[in-house]
Each structure stands twice: as C-alpha cells, then as structure tokens.
C-alpha cells in the first residue's frame, strides 16, 4: 500500500501542503500511509484495520447525511397539512405507540454531534441498530402476511406527537381496522360518526368490544369507508375506482352524509347526474302531489269513488267534446290536470318510476303510470244508414296516473258467492236461470241412498230391463 508515493490524497483537504511535504520529507511517506496519518490526528490507532474498517469513515458520513434527511422528512410529514392515511401493521394501539417512540429516538440519535464508538473488529456500533431494524422489518413483513391492515387518520392541526393512544379510537369496517382521531368527527356533528364520537359520546348506543374497538358501518366496504373518512377532513368524497355511485350513495345514506354535487367528486358524471336527478325528481313530485294531484283525489273520494284516473294535458291542449256524440271509451270518468311542467316531468321513464315509489310510500295501491291516447276534439262524424253514427276524435299522447285506496280489493267476490249455502232462499232457481241448459244437466246431483228410502214406491210401468234388486236397496 505504501510502496510508492502518491501525488494526491483524496481524503486530504490541502493538496498544496501535501505536495510541499512530499518534496521536503519523502521518507515519511514510506513509513506512514495517508490513512494512518489521518487516524493519528484523531487519536485512534487503526494499523490493523480491515477493509471494512477502512471504509467506515465514508459509511459514517453517509449515515449521518441519511439520518439527518430522515429526521427532516419525518418532521415535514408530521407538519403536513394534508391528512394522508398511512398503512401500519400493529397488534394493539399501545404497541404502536411504543414503536413510534423507538423510531423517533433512533432517528434522533445519529444526528447528535457525539462521535460513534468503534468496535474492536472495526465495525461501527450503528450496525447493531441496523440489524435490529432489519429484524424488526422482517417481523413486520410477517405481520403483513397475516393480513392485519391498519389505516391511521390523525388531525393535522394537533400533529401526531400531541395525540395520545387513549385519544384514538379503532373502527372495524369490513375486517379492516381504522385508527382515527375522534376529533375529526366534530366538524360534521349531524352525521352518524359525529353523533357517536361527538359531545354526546357518553350517551352512545354503540359499545366497543372486549378490545375497545368499534364495529361500525356494517355492509360497507373498506374502500368506500376510507373515501368517506376523507370527507371529515376536506368535506369532499372522491369516489374510488371500481365503486359504483349507487353503492357510494347507499353508504352516505347509512352514515347520514348529504349526497350533493359539492360533496361527491367522481369521473362517471352520467351516474352522478342520474342520482342527483332522482333526488330532484322526488322533491319535485312531492310538490306536485300536494298541489295538483291530491285535490283531485279528494274530489273523487267525496263523490264516493275509491280510485282516481288522472290525465295530464299541456296548457295549450283544448278538449272539445260533442255532447250528442261523446267518446265511447270511458274518458268521461277521468280527471284532467292542465300543466305543461307536470307533462314534461312524466315524459321521462325514470321520473315515472320515482313517482310510483313515492305513491307506494304514501300507502296507495294499484298504481299505474304511463302514456296513453286522450281524445281532445271531434274531427268528423260518419253516418251509417240505419245505425249509430261513428264519431272520430283527435287523440294526443299524454301521461296518466291511476291509483286506488280501496282496502278490500284483495277479496274475490266470486269465491264468496260460491261459499254461501242457504235453504231458506227461494230465488236460487231464478238465479240459476242464467246458467246455460247444458250446464244445468251437469250440475244436478245424483240421488243418494238415504233419499231413495223416502221416495214413494211406484209400480213398474212395463220396464222389464230394470233389475228387481235395485228396487229395494236393503236386499
């Protein structure tokens, strides 16, 4: 190693002085290497240093830079304003808290100006820490294979250091644990989670299990719940990929979160607009029901009817029927609403489905909604010789609603009449007169044995084919 002089040492900070020493005292270069001179200034003898020990200075400076970078990154992550969930594998909140303390302590140790101790074999003492960290990471890897996944949600204002373990709650949703700071729910007190962990937490009807964990949001997937937790921090729910809007809507309704355009953000605008249209159609039809439809239903009920047939016409439609020749399809029993807005509302099939669901919720029966032809005015009259004249009306396609509030519509009158048995009614023969003659023959019952006993005995009138034993059934 010291067989020939080196013109320049990369570890030296003053190359001119080194050249001067090289020309003035050339013999010392053959006695001491550059590495031994550097170590002699530090006061440590490394004459028997191995190759690993010789490169320890470079590794030590590199480790210092990495540890300082890690400490800066960790402090930057703790003060980050965005609430990003991090995935950790822990067995309990207490163990997780101890692991975080050990990590903070280990990250702050290399950044101290105190020099590290060298082992007799030339290795640095931080190698033991790295081996412990590697063993810990291997144990964490085994936890990952076990399938226990924890999402930690913290409040960005307080920071991770100010949150104690007792101030966190663990929510179990779809076999996934979410470690959440309950203070994030106070921003939305009208939601289900805001009521559970808000000011009235002592009156909460949901109790934790034996491990102190809360099982909430039954039937909601972990991916959907993770997106909903972002709502308590940012006020916006971003629909994850692969999750349908109806599924997200059902989860929002379960957790009492308003489903509005300012709350939901997704790529499928068609599905989002469809859900928003359903909400708007429900509110609009409830208004139409109270203002336009219900008065006509009351008028039908006051006249003794138990059903109502309503036709929706536009404001420009004109109904002009001939009093002498009215339509012959029963349209005279229909109620009419002149409203172009309601006509446009029922033009869409989705709106008719929403209206039908609202009427079912209000207790009505036999609900039919659709579009049918309705006669407006008389076009011409065809007169037939010796018969009734035929009237031709102009028909327009308009929406209609038919509903009933009859309570006994499920009973069959035909079955009730068949079950009646009475011998005191004498007009049954008159009622049976409407039955065809061929059915009367089939309906006559055959004589029974006990009826033959009371029948009068008549002498045989030349009927030789009759069996004599049949005259006396007792024989």
Swiss-Prot record:
The keyword Ubl conjugation does not apply. It is found in: Nucleus; Cytoplasm. Residues 57-80, 97-107 have a biased composition (Basic and acidic residues). Residues 22-31 have a biased composition (Basic residues). SMART domains: BTB. The keyword Cytoplasm applies. Residues 146-475 are annotated as: Interaction with AKT family members. This is BTB/POZ domain-containing protein 10. It comes from Homo sapiens (Human).
């Amino acid at each position: 190693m010291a067989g020939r002089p080196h013109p320049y040492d990369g570890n030296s900070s003053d190359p001119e002085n080194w050249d001067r020493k090289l020309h003035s005292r050339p013999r010392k270069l053959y006695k001491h290497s550059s590495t031994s001179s550097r170590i002699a200034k530090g006061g440590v003898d490394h004459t028997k240093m191995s190759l690993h020990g010789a490169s320890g200075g470079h590794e030590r400076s590199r480790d210092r830079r990495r540890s300082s970078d890690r400490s800066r990154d960790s402090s930057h992550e703790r003060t980050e304003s965005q609430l990003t969930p991090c995935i950790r594998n822990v067995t309990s909140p207490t163990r997780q808290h101890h692991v975080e303390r050990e990590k903070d302590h280990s990250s702050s140790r290399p950044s101290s100006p105190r020099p590290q101790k060298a082992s007799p074999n030339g290795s640095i003492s931080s190698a033991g820490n790295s081996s412990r960290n590697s063993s810990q990471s291997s144990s964490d890897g085994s936890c990952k294979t076990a399938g226990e996944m924890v999402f930690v949600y913290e409040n960005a204002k307080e920071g991770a250091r100010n949150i104690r373990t007792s101030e966190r709650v663990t929510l179990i949703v779809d076999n996934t644990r979410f470690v959440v700071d309950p203070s994030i729910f106070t921003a939305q007190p009208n939601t289900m989670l805001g009521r559970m962990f808000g000011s009235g937490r002592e009156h909460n009807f949901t109790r934790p299990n034996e491990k102190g964990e809360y099982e909430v949001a039954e039937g909601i997937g972990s991916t959907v719940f993770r997106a909903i937790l972002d709502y308590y921090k940012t006020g916006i729910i971003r629909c994850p990929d692969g999750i349908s809007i109806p599924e997200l809507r059902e989860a929002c309704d379960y957790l009492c979160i308003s489903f509005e355009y300012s709350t939901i953000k997704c790529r499928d605008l068609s599905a989002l607009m469809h859900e928003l249209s359903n909400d708007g159609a429900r509110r609009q039809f409830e208004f139409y029901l109270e203002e336009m439809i219900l008065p006509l239903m009351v008028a039908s009920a006051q006249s003794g009817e138990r059903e109502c047939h309503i036709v929706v016409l536009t404001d420009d439609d004109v109904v002009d029927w001939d009093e002498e020749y009215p339509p012959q399809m029963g349209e005279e029993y229909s109620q009419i609403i002149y409203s172009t807005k309601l006509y446009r509302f029922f033009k869409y099939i989705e709106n008719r489905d929403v209206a039908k669901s609202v009427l079912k919720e209000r207790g009505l029966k036999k609900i039919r909604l659709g579009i049918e032809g309705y006669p407006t005015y008389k076009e011409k009259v065809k007169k037939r010789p010796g018969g009734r004249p035929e009237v031709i009306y102009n028909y327009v396609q308009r929406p209609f609603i038919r509903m009933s509030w009859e309570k006994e519509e499920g009973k069959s009158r035909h079955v009730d009449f068949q079950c009646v048995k009475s011998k005191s009614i004498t007009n049954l023969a008159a009622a049976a007169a409407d039955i065809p003659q061929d059915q009367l023959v089939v309906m006559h019952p055959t004589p029974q044995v006990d009826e033959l006993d009371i029948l009068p005995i008549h002498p045989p009138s030349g009927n030789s084919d009759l069996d004599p034993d049949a005259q006396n059934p007792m024989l």
